[in-house]
Amino acid sequence: GGMGTSGLLNAWCPFTDGEKIIYKGIAERVFSESKKGVPHIHYDNWVPINGEYLKVVYDDLVTSEGVSVLFFTTMAAVEMKRKGVVDAIVVANKAGLSTYKAKVYIDCTGDGDLAAWAGADFVIGDESGSVQEGTLCFTLSNVDPYEFSLIGNVHTNRKDGPIHSIYGNPKYPLVKDKHMNDKLIGPGILGFNAGHVTVDSTDPVSYTHLPSPR
């Protein structure tokens, strides 16, 4: 849920094979419910994500099943009973450090932190350790709907799109490729997914001090 909400990702990757939805279960339920937050969209691939609406969808899914939620709480450590068996997890929030025990632990960290810290085997990146580059997601509000309707979009596919004059311009040395797509999230709100940055999301030093562009 983090990428579609706090991560500001602007669209779902395709859920269909071109004819029908192929992801079922919880995935389809989340997708179908989240589409209600973008009622202006009438297609099923690359559907915009209304992050604020998606938060409610996720909250409703877990609370309707009786789950007690703690916002702004992060897993801090794993305590092992023995090799391969988790005894407890330690979480951190404004109340400090707290320990929780359960019969079953489900890793929802996104990066597999619980499994990795518990000693599970894992692989990061390619043979050299390089990982897929991240993109920069952001939103713009108070966009004039009339002016935007005249433009349509600023996607890279448009030969007259602004990214083509930005890329290679010495004024913007951090822009190292032409990746740019935008989605109309709601009235006067555009969501963007643009550019790439060389960063390892599992390394705090990496995403705090981004390397210089190639």
Where are these regions (language model features)?
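A conserved hydrophobic secondary-structure block that centers on an alpha-helix together
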Residues: K81-V85, A92-L97
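Solvent-exposed loop/turn segments at secondary-structure junctions
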Residues: A76, G96, G112-D113, P145, ...
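Conserved small/polar residues in nucleotide/adenosyl-binding loops
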Residues: T208-P213
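Glycine-rich loop(s) and the adjacent beta-strand/alpha-helix scaffold that form part
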Residues: D107-I151
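Long, well-ordered, tryptophan-enriched scaffold segments
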Residues: T135-I189
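Conserved N-terminal/central alpha/beta ligand/cofactor-binding core
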Residues: G2-K81, Q132-E133, G186
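Core beta-strand elements of the Rossmann-like FAD/NAD(P) dinucleotide-binding domain
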Residues: G96-V104
